Amino acid sequence: MLEILKRSLYDAPVFKRGDYNYFIHPITDGVPETRPELIREVVCHIIRIADLDVDKIVTVEAMGIPIGGALSLVTDIPLVIIRKKMYGLPGEIEVSQVTGYSKSKIYLNGIKKGDRVIFVDDVVSTGGTAIAVMKALEAAGAVIRDAVVVIERGAGAERVRSAGYPLKTMVKVDVDEKRVFRVEEVSFRS
């Protein structure tokens, strides 16, 4: 399973950003192009492994959008996108996001108390974004039924789970300064 995803990860170029070996991939960057068969494979796998007894799908701008959008289209579950822009709407929650290479603010709107949600995203590296999003969802009164991230890298997924949040991943990758050298399919980590 996930042969298209695995093959595409092995083909991903890598560059150094500070001390971080950053791989460039259609799921994580939208570059060079995002093929429909790749998104289809990812979304079909999410449907197989996720608890979709939810009111809303939640994702983060930008690279969670292709995954969350496709999942929403297939399941008819509404999509909430956590944005990088503040809108100032009533109930908006500011989220401090820390990734493997940057810090920023993102903004959650469209979640009501009692909403049952699934969080989907492209990659978890440090776990900073996922933990911040889960805390914001809890602050909004949402019930986090599940979380699925396509690519697991580093110790971030374990950090998320250790913080008490659900998280399933699809593949785990290891990257050095030249290439993605290991892609391992994950069987039902939650």
Swiss-Prot record:
Record's function text: Catalyzes a salvage reaction resulting in the formation of IMP that is energically less costly than de novo synthesis.
Pathway: Purine metabolism; IMP biosynthesis via salvage pathway; IMP from hypoxanthine: step 1/1
Tagged with keyword Transferase: yes
Molecular functions per Gene Ontology: guanine phosphoribosyltransferase activity; hypoxanthine phosphoribosyltransferase activity
GO biological process: IMP salvage; purine ribonucleoside salvage
Record's catalysed reaction(s): IMP + diphosphate = hypoxanthine + 5-phospho-alpha-D-ribose 1-diphosphate; GMP + diphosphate = guanine + 5-phospho-alpha-D-ribose 1-diphosphate
Main localization, broad class: cytoplasm
Protein known as: Hypoxanthine/guanine phosphoribosyltransferase
Taxonomic source organism: Methanothrix thermoacetophila (strain DSM 6194 / JCM 14653 / NBRC 101360 / PT)
GO cellular-component term (any): cytoplasm
Keywords carried by this UniProt record: Cytoplasm, Glycosyltransferase, Purine salvage, Transferase
Protein family according to the UniProt entry: Belongs to the purine/pyrimidine phosphoribosyltransferase family. Archaeal HPRT subfamily.
Gene assigned in the entry: hpt
UniProt xrefs under HAMAP family: Hypx_phosphoribosyltr
Keyword Chaperone recorded: no
Localization of this protein: Cytoplasm
Matching CDD domains: PRTases_typeI (cd06223)
InterPro entries: HGPRTase-like (IPR026597), PRibTrfase_dom (IPR000836), PRTase-like (IPR029057), Pur/Pyrimidine_PRTase (IPR050118)
Subunit structure: Homodimer.
